[in-house]
Amino acid sequence: MAIVKMKRLQVLALERDHDAILRRLQHMGCLEISEPDTEALPDTLRRCDAATADCLARQRQLQTAMDTLRRTAPPPKAGLLTPRPRISERDYLDEASLAAELETAQRINELSADINRLTAKETQLRSEQAALRPWRSLDVPLELTETRWCDITTGTLPPFAHWDEVQGALASQIPEAEAYLLYADREQQCLLLLTHKTVTAAALELLRSFGFAGGQLKGRRGTPEENLTALDDALRQTAAEKENARQALAALGDKLPDLQLCSDRLSSRLMREENRKRLLTDGCIVAFDGWVPAVKLPKLAAWLDTLDCAYDVSDPTAKEIPNVPVQLHGNVLTRSMNCITEQYSMPAYDGVDPNPIMAPFFIFFFGMMMADMGYGLAMIVGSLLFLKKKRPANRSFMEMIFWCGIMTFIFGALTGGFLGDFIPQLCKLIDPASTVALPSLFDPLNDTMAIMVGSLVLGGIQVFTGMAVSVVEKCRNGHFPDALFDEITWWIILAGGAMALLGVGSVGGVPVVLCIGGVMLLYGAGRGKKGFGKVTGVVAAVYNGVTGFFSDILSYVRLMALMLSGAVLAQVFNMLGATTGNIVTFVIISLVGNTLNLALNLLGCYVHDMRLQFLEFFGRFYKDGGKAFRPLCMQSNYVEIVKEEHE
């Protein structure tokens, strides 16, 4: 179980075959095509044309259609364990079906746009109705604004304008003008103004002093009542069109699975087009290079031998090492740690795969913190059901829960915990004289000190393991002096300190081993430095080494703390249920409380376990910065593709 060895593959093929090559590579899913160095390209080569923009546009169109269906015709909610539908690779790559699904998406988007347009039209028509209703009593055509001798003007006054004052001002100052109040509410007063043409301007000027505003009905023809009738007809027609569009959209509600399949097909096509841009061509040939796992190379090479192409395989050079993609290989136990490692950072290609070393510690610590047979059984059964029924594409997280569930059950058996003290409390409710208790090796509540010491010992073991891995890696890379003075020196110092405390290994009262470690520390901390830098180097090495080592060890006290808190909470919920004196109520309260405790502990143990790995363990040896292996393959989010062997 280690980082998969990669080979660099360089291919030169005929341009007419490049599409078939890309499709077969996508089927095989074992080659990551590298991005070409465009600055070093000769003038005769260029990138292959790719339809990425078209794929992205279609993907957006499809996503809009799916969002519309989920909003307007939501499908039945799928169960938690409902698996993705399976589809053969041949059907998955059916271009005719893809075209039909894209037409369906376009139709859905058109209907959605029609509904939005008609909704906006309804809003506009209702707004026009609201503006015309105050003028309903006006029986004069709105296009009639003047006669031979008179001007006809409509307008509004603010609600605070006193109508009697307006009429009085007109009568006293402009007797050739007459105003009629048609409607009044809290927002406005609507009026009709009749004036002799010679005094129209003066009358309007007078009314403006009261806040008059005109022009609300400008551009309309017919009476307000006729306009309102026409608006009612338009609203009914718009509502009918909108309902027809809604029904047509609802009829397409069962197309969501087809659109989801289409989305997956487009994702695979987009990935193929993005990789097509990495191919170089001069119009006659195409050239590309990439990375392939060494174990997959024979099958890929056998297929390349059947083509009219030339290819070359080589190991990555020292200059290429930082750019080599990383793929982790593990067994059924260690691959469950992939979800943990990927959250931190992929290891460098020339680093070490942490999963085989981390897996025992992570699972052991998780089980120790949870430590309950009931919780362990729930984790085991839940993860197995999810893996079997759901068939997730990424299984590592649920596999991790499964292994942690087994260890949780084991520690629960050691501590005698089954949903806390559920069984003893239940037995006491049935028979108050009951003394039933599950057998246990130790009790988290009564053996706190022993558990704390055990946590520190386990922390020391993991920290020393990380240091040992660092020593091996440094020696393998030819950096033995670094291993000697950075890790082995501290082993000697710690061993010498322990021997001195036990009174072992001293000569004439002098702790020899401790003194040897001290000399090595003084020499190693000052190596490569001159003058006063040696002094500061020694001081920094001693301070950082002592504080760093012991603070890392102390961090493992959280193992005891999480175990204790989980056990206490479980017992508290059981105690609350037992106070009712009713078995049914006790079971309900206990199960609800323990469910909450399980959820809380799952999150807490997961986070704290990761923290121990990332900070205390990885900090000792881990070299990160790797780039995950991303081969050209068929991507799917909604369906499960059943691979078929090509002849």
Regions found by a protein language model. Name each.
Residues 1-358, 394-398:
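Long, charged N-terminal accessory/stalk domains
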